[in-house]
Curated annotation (Swiss-Prot):
PANTHER family hit by this protein: GLUCOSE INHIBITED DIVISION PROTEIN A, PROTEIN MTO1 HOMOLOG, MITOCHONDRIAL
Gene field: mnmG
Family annotation (NCBIfam families): mnmG_gidA
Name of the protein: tRNA uridine 5-carboxymethylaminomethyl modification enzyme MnmG
Taxonomic source organism: Rhodopseudomonas palustris (strain BisB18)
GO cellular component: cytosol
Biological classification of the source: Bacteria, Pseudomonadati, Pseudomonadota, Alphaproteobacteria, Hyphomicrobiales
Length: 625
């Protein structure tokens, strides 16, 4: 067995798979260390990928030739574009997935990735020398050497499951936790915290009264996540929707003292935007009902995931709750819901590359950084894997900022502000939403990926052809123009100012769509429908994008003012409070400093002025020595 690698990735979940594949795509010899290969790509919680904000992350992972989008397309059994009635900037692609198909597709891609080996073992300790990681020790005593290590342990770090009054160590139901690595982190001086998440009971779909619930079909035709997926081929299913009732709430109120969250058994924070059903009833007791989505877990699997009733109440209470919900009164519970507590590292311990500040060569991704969700984990895994491979080869680093994509927004939020509860991605977290759309993720990021070397030949060829087609289509649409009087003959009412307007400009008008401009200029019919859709969106946002481009330029100027070597004691005019916050956080740039809690605009102005003054004092060429 090989005992030395460029990169070792610990954990075979969504972060680990992306990290291992990304490192291997850059040519790094990579080991994916996991308890059992059979659990690689497992969907531990809900059987779905994407959603609002999250779908953007999946598209961005795909744009950098990651796995999740293609795997979701191969495993997807219902596709929906959320927020379809709203603008493209806040739409979110989402898919229900067949758990078995999803895991099988992920495992097949992992096995087919050159330079990537799978090691079935438990990682027990980190090996270090002179402030740098050198490898890992397995539970059986074997040692594996590496130039960089990525840890993606999910909920396994000292995982503790809670079900009613009972609790036991586990990383997932029926799977052992990782205890040794938590001790390694503590020995190395990392600040560890505890978080919790939960999952609902699983139901036998054959015992659900589907006639008593509302049915929700997917989109037709289904829209894939990956630009490389030509067509979704799986049969598509419907989901069900039901609601809790006042009787449900009465059962929960009568038993809430038996919930580990309210008995004092669980002290850690859970996800605010995905609360347990008992938390919903306590916090929103005035509502007459809460929605529950009944999500089938597979095409040949009767298991149904009731999204919306995550709980850790005792098993018999869970059965009593189900008996009060329309359509579920006679359902069979296959497995009770439960809560799980686990260790996480304060993400402010990390650089924007996801490398640990206190230990060179160690990268962290996923729930260990305080996030929740498959998509958040996958995006972090990809960034950590790329940087681990770059470090191992001596090839620099890649950091995505808030203007690059949602993955940059998420990582900046984590490493700058830290977390007090599990972090979830939303479109509202991004300042540059009009630029960072799910539909243009490849236009924003694939070029960077090609330059970096992490994008394969198939995607490179596809991207090059697409960008050329887009440029050609835009040039044609901008070259075709009419006067207001000519437009009136086609039923368009424009200002009678004598100004000619191009087809591209007309698409920005609310009453003008592609069909209308195509009717005026039949030559536009030659443009491929997918390219026409991109062009229509670009035209709609064109005037706003010009304004946002100016905002991004200002942001990038602040990001270009580096603070990495500054001595804050030498900066005149800074308050002691500002000095203390800056010393503790050690932000990399003035832009990042501005996103720290409690730092005033005045302090930022002092910093920026000091840096510019300092740069003017330095003689030319001083940076080179």
């Amino acid at each position: 067995m090989q005992t030395s690698f460029d990169v070792i990735v610990i954990g075979g979940g969504h972060a680990g798979c992306e990290a291992a594949a990304a490192a291997a795509r850059l040519g790094a010899t990579t080991a994916l260390v996991t308890h059992r290969f059979a659990t690689v790509g497992a969907m531990s919680c809900n059987p779905a990928i994407g959603g609002l904000g999250k779908g953007h992350l999946v598209r961005e992972v795909d744009a950098l030739d990651g796995l999740m989008g293609r795997v979701a397309d191969q495993g997807g059994i219902q596709f929906r574009m959320l927020n379809r009635r709203k603008g493209p900037a806040v739409r979110g692609p989402r898919a229900q997935a067949d758990r078995k198909l999803y895991a099988a597709a992920m495992q097949a891609l992992i096995l087919a990735t050159p330079h990537l080996s799978v090691v079935e073992a438990e990682a027990d300790d980190l090996l270090t020398s002179d402030g740098r990681i050198t490898g890992i020790r397995l539970a059986d005593g074997r040692e594996l050497g590496a130039g960089a290590v990525v840890i993606t342990t999910g909920t396994f770090l000292r995982g503790l499951i809670h079900l009613g009054e009972r609790s036991w160590p586990a990383g997932r139901i029926d799977e052992a936790p990782a205890l040794g690595l938590s001790k390694s982190f503590e020995r190395l001086g990392f600040a560890l915290g505890r978080l919790k998440t939960g999952t609902p009971p699983r139901l036998d779909g054959r015992s659900i009264d589907w006639g008593a619930v509302e049915m929700q079909p997917g989109d037709e035709p289904p829209e894939p996540f990956s630009v490389l997926t030509e067509k979704i081929t799986n049969p598509q299913i419907e989901c069900g929707i039901t609601r809790t009732t006042p009787a449900t709430h009465a059962v929960i109120r009568a038993n809430v003292h038996r919930s580990p969250m309210y008995s004092g058994q669980i002290q850690s924070s859970g996800p605010r935007y995905c609360p347990s059903i008992e938390d919903k009833i306590v916090r929103f007791g005035d509502r007459d009902g809460h929605q529950i989505f009944l999500e089938p877990e597979g095409l040949d699997d009767p298991t149904v995931y009731p999204n919306g009733i995550s709980t850790s109440l005792p098993e018999e209470v869970q059965r009593a709750i189900l008996a009060t919900i329309p359509g579920l009164q006679r359902t069979t519970m296959l497995r009770p819901g439960y809560a799980i507590e686990y260790d996480h590292v304060d993400p402010r311990e990390l650089e924007p590359t996801l490398q640990a500040k206190r230990l060179r060569g160690l990268f962290l991704a996923g729930q260990i950084n305080g996030t929740t969700g498959y998509e958040e984990a996958a995006a972090q895994g990809l960034v950590a894997g790329l940087n681990a491979a770059l470090l191992a080869s001596g090839g620099g680093e890649i950091a995505f900022d808030r203007a690059d994509g949602y993955l940059g927004v998420m990582i900046d939020d984590l490493v700058t502000r830290g977390i007090t509860e599990p972090y979830r991605m939303f479109t509202s977290r991004a300042e540059y939403r009009l630029t960072l759309r799910a539909d243009n993720a490849d236009q924003r990021l694939t070029g960077q990926g090609i330059a970096l070397g992490c994008v394969g030949a198939e995607r490179t060829e596809f991207h090059t052809a697409k960008m050329a087609a887009l440029a050609q289509a835009k040039a044609l649409a901008q070259s075709l123009a009419i006067t207001p009087s000519q437009a009136a003959k086609h039923g368009l009412s424009l200002n009678r100012d004598g100004v000619r307007r191009s087809a591209f400009e007309l698409l920005a008008y609310p009453e003008v769509d592609w069909a209308r401009v195509e009717a005026i200029w039949p030559e536009l019919a030659a443009i491929e429908p997918s390219i026409a859709t991109h062009l229509e969106i670009d035209a709609t946002y064109d005037v706003y994008l010009k304004r946002q481009t100016a905002d991004v330029e200002g942001f990038r100027r602040d990001e270009g003012l580096l603070l990495t070597e500054i001595d804050y004691a030498l900066v005149p005019g800074l308050s002691n409070e500002a000095r203390g916050r800056l010393e503790k956080a050690r932000p990399r740039t003035v832009g990042q400093a501005g996103r720290l809690d409690g730092l005033t605009p005045a302090a930022l102005g002092i910093l920026a002025a000091y840096l510019r003054r300092d740069q003017r004092r330095k003689p030319a060429g001083s940076a080179a020595g």
